[in-house]
Curated annotation (Swiss-Prot):
The keyword Protease does not apply. Residues 1-22 form the signal peptide. The lineage of its organism: Eukaryota, Metazoa, Chordata, Craniata, Vertebrata. One of its GO terms (cellular component) is extracellular space. It is found in: Secreted. It comes from Pangasius pangasius. Disulfide bonds join C71-C173, C190-C198. Belongs to the somatotropin/prolactin family. The gene is gh. The keyword Nucleus does not apply. This is Somatotropin. One of its GO terms (molecular function) is growth hormone receptor binding. Transmembrane segments: none annotated.
Length: 200
């Protein structure tokens, strides 16, 4: 009888521990999604404010640029489209999100200090890093030898109020990448929850 009670105690304790770990994991995912949603909204607002300040002729000229423009982060391997995102593992989505955020560490300094974007990105990167460690659980990280995409060096040298084209590209790419990360983290969060429907 005593042995049965001991076994039951161990089982109950392990269940509580497992449930606690699940709740903590969900809390971390929720926090990461909220943070990237805020950054995406911030990027959209900055883009809107930038476009509103343009003259009609400037707006018309710039609207033709971005669809043909290359973003620095395009060199980062990432799921393309809904189907590929759905098929990607949680670890792959987290790793891709981490690299996208990391690629903005230096360029974000050109996006304006009032909103503390660099600090927000650093916090999000740290949170995603914790989630990756939780998913790895002793495994080796994937793509360890991936080299980070080169920074937006041309933007650093020429970005100014007078250089509308590069300002527009930088803001457009930032908004595009924050949308990607928001999508990847939302799918990863859903996969780690009890929700069986994680369609986009």
């Amino acid at each position: 009888m005593a042995r049965v009670l001991v076994v039951l105690s161990v089982v109950v304790a392990s269940l509580f521990f497992s449930q606690g770990a699940t709740f903590e994991n969900q809390r971390l995912f929720n926090n990461a999604v909220i943070r990237v949603q805020h950054l995406h909204q911030l990027a959209a607002k900055m883009m809107d404010d930038f476009e509103e300040a343009l003259l009609p002729e400037e707006r018309k000229q710039l609207s033709k640029i971005f669809p043909l423009s290359f973003c620095n982060s395009d060199s980062i391997e990432a799921p393309a489209g809904k189907d590929e995102t759905q098929k990607s593992s949680v670890l792959k989505l987290l790793h891709t999100s981490y690299r996208l955020i990391e690629s903005w560490e230096f360029p974000s300094k050109n996006l304006g200090n009032p909103n503390h974007i660099s600090e927000k990105l650093a916090d999000l990167k740290m949170g995603i890093g914790v989630l990756i460690e939780g998913c790895l659980d002793g495994q080796t990280s994937l793509d360890e030898n991936d080299s980070l995409a080169p920074p937006f060096e041309d933007f650093y040298q020429t970005l100014s109020e007078g250089n509308l084209r590069k300002s527009f590209r930088l803001l457009s790419c930032f908004k595009k990448d924050m949308h990607k990360v928001e999508t990847y983290l939302s799918v990863a969060k859903c996969r780690r929850s009890l929700d069986s429907n994680c369609t986009l």
